[in-house]
Amino acid sequence: HDGDDTLHSIPYQPSIFGFFYNKTLFAKAGIESTPTTWAELDAACAKLKDAGITPITADDAYLTSFIGYHLARYIGQDGVKALVTGEEYNGESVTWDDEKVKAAAESFADFAKKGYFSKNIATNKYPAGQNQEFAPGNAAIVICGSWLPNEAKDSVADDLEWGYFNY
């Protein structure tokens, strides 16, 4: 605060959130580029599964972030906020019965039916997914933030080559 009612700030802890992946496991499954769309993520997960590799894991603390992130691809970030708060978005209410909301949910159900999620994803308590599945190379993708490398450093396989993507 500089005395003229102007508040100044310095970014303290910038971070990103998305998909960390194991480059070695992607190469083993024949994936040559990182996914940039849901369809490409679907195709990559199919290749991983076919290669006997668990495609995706997460922890309880971050799984809902993945859902919100994906839902925003259908209704926008402001639409997700409106859905959660009950506010209007673009002059209309957004409900759980909205066709786009249903489509996002169905795409998650499709991934589950295809076996793309770790069998432990629903019960992983932070930091199990990142430290017991992703870091040692037992799952190819983990949904997490930029704090992951530091948090998982004691569990990381010696040959882990990190990568990061969003779609």
Residue ranges of model-derived segments:
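Extracytoplasmic/periplasmic substrate-recognition and gating elements
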Residues: A29, K114, D154-Y167
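Bilobed periplasmic-binding protein-like "clamshell/Venus-flytrap" ligand-binding domains
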Residues: H8-S9, D50-D60
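Hinge/lid segment of periplasmic solute-binding proteins
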Residues: H1-F17, D42, K100
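Beta->alpha turn/N-cap motifs
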Residues: C144-P149, Y167
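Short helix-initiation/N-cap motifs at beta->coil->alpha
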Residues: T36-D42, N120-A135
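Alpha-to-beta junction loops
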Residues: A51-P55, A135-C144, L160
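Short, solvent-exposed loop/beta-turn-alpha elements that line the ligand-binding surface or hinge
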Residues: H1, G76-A103, D154-A157
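Glycine-centered hinge/linker elements that transmit conformational signals in sensory
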Residues: C45, E87-I121
